[in-house]
Amino acid sequence: MLRAWQDVIVKWRLVPDDLPGNDPEGAQHADLARSALLDGRLDDALTEFGHATRLRDHPLDQVGIGDVHLARGRWDEADERYQRALAAGGAAALLARLGITQVLIGEGRAAGAIADLEHLVADRPHDPTLRYYLASAWYSVAEQSRSRTADDTLVITSEQQLLICEQAAERILTLKTGDDELDRGAEHLLNEVAMGRRWTWAPEGIAVSLAVLTVAFGLITVVAGGLMGSALVVIAGVVVGAGLLFAIVWRFRRQTWRRRADEMASEITRKGV
């Protein structure tokens, strides 16, 4: 699934309004199709792009038909149209490449789209449209990497997922797309990562009680050894108390993300990376 409807259509900003053409009627149908697509009227867009393809052979029409299929989740049909446009080259090739990356994202393979988008942004670092697509892809990577419950709650269940979310959020913010939704999402991801790395006791009540008892045992043993004048008892109290305290910390002190992952384990329906 794509992150947002605009991921289908934003790439059309890259098309100049004064593209040359030798078939006025075909161009007219293409303009109507593009307008319908941008308005979300997919049936009208498909009809008009179809008329255009019967009157002319233009790769942008293939991109447009691919976008209709993309919006409807027909990944194979969309990819076929984008590949045709890519093979034709010209101004449509860039849009076709972007379309192919969106197919990968829609198929749940967002990580596979990152390399090509990073190359595009490296070639044109000041292009806001390309930066937007890269940021959106990174957000999809973060979504697809996490585990998911039946009600579509995303849960970090591995250290790798934690690192991916952090990397994605930082990259989104450095791209400075100006998209409020993406920026808020990235900031939320960073907060989730920070919260996930916090240490906590699990289960808290038992851990705290055992820690208190262990410290008390150590103090009592040391005091008793001192009153008895036995250095051996004092040393034993210190060593045993320290060992027990270490064991409690090792057993019960966990990062928040691990604790939540354990709590949600029975509800996970799709595991992440």
Regions found by a protein language model. Give the residues of each.
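N-terminal topogenic membrane-targeting module
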Residues: 21, 25, 29, 262-273
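Generic low-polarity alpha-helical segments
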Residues: 1-15, 165-172, 182, 269
